[in-house]
């Protein structure tokens, strides 16, 4: 739904399947935010979101977690982002639930740093591109 809603709002969405031997094991979606999706729901977007790339979704099937697929997917997503498909940007941001310590640790290990902003109830972390 998020990729569909992004069309026509000034945002671009790039969905990717995460596969092992041609079998899907997860999903990742990159977004670029020119005008915020938040205008649709009256929330003020985090400042780091405007004019920057985001990893909107990262999901790995439970059977394939703790095998490096998430870390590799993030690395490949950042490689893709650095081709500047929507133009240059300063940051890539990602957000996560505060109680999801595993996600927070993964994102920090990939270079993301929490910046004190929140996206709804989620913590925002950014990586300088």
Q: Where in the sequence are the language-model features?
A:
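Acetyl-CoA-dependent GNAT
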Residues: 1-63, 74-76, 80-86, 116-119
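Conserved beta-strand-loop-alpha-helix junction that forms the acyl-donor binding cleft
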Residues: 88-104, 120-123, 128-129
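Short glycine-rich hinge loops at helix-strand junctions in the catalytic core
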Residues: 68, 86, 111
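Short, well-ordered turn and helix-capping elements at secondary-structure junctions
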Residues: 32-34, 59, 98, 111, ...
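Conserved active-site alpha-helix within GNAT-family acetyltransferase domains
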Residues: 71, 97-116
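Active-site acidic-Proline motif in GNAT/NAT acetyltransferases
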Residues: 61-63, 67, 98-99
């Amino acid at each position: 739904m998020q990729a569909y809603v992004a069309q026509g709002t000034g945002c671009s969405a790039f969905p990717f399947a995460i596969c092992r031997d041609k079998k899907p094991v997860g999903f990742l979606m990159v977004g670029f935010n020119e005008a915020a999706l938040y205008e649709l729901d009256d929330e003020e977007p985090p400042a780091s979101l405007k004019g920057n790339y985001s990893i909107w979704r990262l999901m790995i099937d439970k059977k394939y977690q703790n095998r490096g697929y998430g870390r590799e997917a993030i690395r490949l997503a950042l490689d893709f982002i650095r081709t500047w498909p929507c133009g240059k940007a300063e940051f890539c941001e990602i957000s996560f639930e505060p109680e999801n310590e595993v996600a927070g640790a993964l994102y920090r290990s990939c270079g993301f740093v929490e910046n004190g902003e929140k996206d709804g109830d989620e913590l925002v972390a950014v990586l300088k591109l």
